[in-house]
């Protein structure tokens, strides 16, 4: 029964994260946004380091963008529509440092999402992550840019 409650909590958190709109940011100018939620405390995960990489022609990962989540658990302004061209990208969320800052020893070093972007034309991507010390879930919301 406890596992069912945990599953429902995780699903509810994913719905919350994926449905919530950006806070005070013009979504039409944000082609890549990351949202991070702390499932243990039921709150935004603040000050979480996020690194974005782009796969190069030689199959290596080149640094593309980085930043930290805000008080709302969101990270905007990672790139522009002009820079965010078709390709394979990796979003790496530093979960270990986040949990260590709260005095918790986590299992994972980081959460990672690898995806193909803009292969069907320009799109806007919201990568959402729901974190706990021993697990994480991710989802993506992909939309057409607003004119």
UniProtKB/Swiss-Prot annotation:
L-thyroxine binds at residues 35, 74, 137. Keywords: Glycoprotein, Hormone, Phosphoprotein, Secreted, Signal, Sulfation, Thyroid hormone, Transport. Sulfonation of the reactive cysteine Cys-30 enhances the stability of the native conformation of TTR, avoiding misassembly of the protein leading to amyloid formation. InterPro entries: Thyroxine_BS, Transthyretin/HIU_hydrolase, Transthyretin/HIU_hydrolase_d, Transthyretin/HIU_hydrolase_sf, Transthyretin_CS. Pfam families: Transthyretin. SUPFAM superfamilies: Transthyretin (synonym: prealbumin) (SSF49472). Glycans are attached at residue 118. This is Transthyretin. The gene is TTR.
């Amino acid at each position: 029964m406890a596992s069912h409650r945990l599953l429902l909590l995780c699903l509810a958190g994913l719905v919350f994260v994926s449905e919530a709109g950006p806070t005070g940011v013009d979504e039409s100018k944000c082609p890549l946004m990351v949202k991070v939620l702390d499932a243990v405390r039921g709150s935004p995960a603040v000050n979480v380091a996020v690194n974005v990489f782009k796969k190069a022609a030689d199959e290596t990962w080149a640094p593309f963008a980085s930043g930290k989540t805000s008080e709302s658990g969101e990270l905007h302004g990672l790139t522009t529509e002009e820079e965010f061209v078709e390709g394979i990208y990796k979003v790496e969320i530093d979960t270990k440092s986040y949990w260590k800052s709260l005095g918790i020893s986590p299992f994972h070093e980081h959460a990672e999402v690898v995806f193909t972007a803009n292969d069907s034309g320009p799109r806007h991507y919201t990568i959402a992550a729901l974190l706990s010390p021993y697990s994480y879930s991710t989802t993506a919301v992909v939309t057409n840019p607003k004119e």
